[in-house]
Every structure is written in C-alpha cells, then in structure tokens.
Amino acid sequence: MSAPLLEIDGLCVVPPGAAAPVCRDISFALARGSRTALVGPSGAGKTSLLRAINGSLPAQAGSVTVDDCRLDPRRARQLRAFRRKVAVIPQKHDLVEGLRVHQNVMAGALGRWSNWRALRFLFWPLAAELAEARQALEKVELADKLQVRAGALSGGQQQRVAIARALVQQPLLILADEPVASLDPRMAHQVLELLCRLAEEEGVALICTLHQPELAAQYFPRILEMEGGRLVDDRHGDRAKDSPSMRPLQRSEQALSA
C-alpha cells in the first residue's frame, strides 16, 4: 500500500484572540487522487481546518504532512515548497476583478515564479504563458474569456476561473471551501461535476467543504463530518445520508429550499 498523500495527526487550532479551539484533536489521512467532502453546520470548524492544512492558520498542536513534506510555518522556504503542493479555491473566489481572466488564472503559477517574472507577466505576458492560461481555461470551458476582465463574469464563471487558477498551480491537493455556496442548484451541480472530473483527470486529491449533504453524497466517495471543532463521522458517500448525525443538516437544507 502506498503512503497517504495527506496525513493530519492530533491537529489543534486556536485562532488569535479566540477563547477555545476551533479544531480539536483532528486526525485523518487521504490517499493520492482521492475525493473527500467535509460537512457540518456553520461554525463547526470546516474552513478553519482547511486554513490550517494550508498553513494560513497556525496550529497549536499536531502536524500536517503532504507528500512527505511536513508543514512548518517557521521556515519560509519549507512553507513555500509546502504551499506549492496545496491549491486553495476560497469561497469568495479572490479574483482581482480589474485584471483580465488570463492574469487571474496565471496567479496560480506565482509559487513557482520569481518576483520579476510575476511583475513582467502583468505587462508583457509571453505567448507560452498565455497558452498555458488558455489551456487551463479550456478545461473549464472558458477559453473565450481569456482577455475579459474578471469583474464582467457571472458568479459561476468566476468560480470556474478559480478552478483553472488552482490547476495552473499544478498541486497534489486542492482545498475547495464552499465552492457552490453562492450558486443556484443547477450551477452548483455543474461546478461540482467539473471540479470532481478535473481532479480525477489531473490525479489531484480534493477536499471540498459543503453544507448540502445530498451533494456530498452524490459527488464524494468519502465524507468527513465536523461538529464543535471535532471530527464526529467518517463514512462512505453511499451511506452518508443514512447517518443520524447528517439528518439535521438535511432538514435545514430542505427548509431553506422550501
């Protein structure tokens, strides 16, 4: 059996100024190329866990290891190498709306570019760099938006640009934080289908936080559930909706859609 891609052991996270941990003794492992949904009510600690995995929220205890590289925020070079392996798709997209789509997409390459190359790209992009941006946009069916300003795109299109940006990073793991939270049901299915298909085609592991248990069960073979900063359930997608702890989430979702 091959070694897991991601290993989390005893992770405890207390944000600055917080009185209590937002993640408590979290431990699990993920295989390379696997797809996992992270579910739970608001405030359960899902986003904080993703931020801790990426190193943007420091942990007070425990460890995070990706591809045999242990996260150590105190070592700048090691942290930079670690973050190259982990791409983040934030809930708010984090696109620069005044820049063109190809510029936002190629921001995914900043971790492997020098500062000079990044600055030069903003004003004088090379043909090869534009070709790489176009290739990533073709994967998310937005190649015709290469030169459009990001602010002119719809919410679903902006989410797909964020996915293309993550692919350009060439990561081993993608962390997607509520990628369909602001989308209507039809667009939510389209984005999840695209995200899961591309992760499988690229051989990239995927962790996706979701509020909708039925979407988690439909698109993800494994579901981790959080409550009160702890992992309370770890089960396969085909049995997830039968879990008693998932039923309050289902009732809440049904009430919102009624």
Q: Residues of each region from the PLM?
A:
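Conserved catalytic motifs of ABC-family nucleotide-binding domains
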Residues: 170
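Catalytic Walker B motif of ABC-type/P-loop ATPase nucleotide-binding domains
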Residues: 174-177
